[in-house]
Amino acid sequence: MPQIVDAVKLPVVAAGGIADARGMVAAFALGASGVQMGTVFLSCEESGASPNHRKALLTREAGTTALTRGFTGRLARGIKNQLLDELNKKETEILPYPLQRALVRHLSIPAEKAERRDLLPLWAGQSARLSRCEDVSVLLSNLVAQVSEIAGSVQRWSAIRSSQPQPETR
């Protein structure tokens, strides 16, 4: 990311794998002007994700994700389950977007009603295990407070470090 920040005059927004304040601070330290967080918001009731999808994000299985074109015909990441595995076995038979999306959506309706999470397209990023069930306003408030806390720790460390004698360089 530092190379991109140095090479462009536009704001750089970090995305992918950022699900908590530590990831946000790391992105800012590397020069990002902002961050885009996705999966961490899916477990919030306000997300519009189905109850089964939100529950799946809070399980151990959420830590095992894989890439697939099977959900929509376009590359996406999801929680590994029977549906994802079966679709990936038939990768050469996957329809182009939006046909594949329509097909999977049609199959998802009865799976959702039957609470068959193993047959649902469970979109999730690599940091899905960091998801927690919170109201979105609580999640945002916590993120702001935690970023401030981490930033304060970094500033204190920097002040301590700069007050120590530095070795001579030749």
Where are the regions that the model predicts?
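Conserved active-site-proximal phosphate/metal-binding subdomains
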Residues: 1-13, 18-170
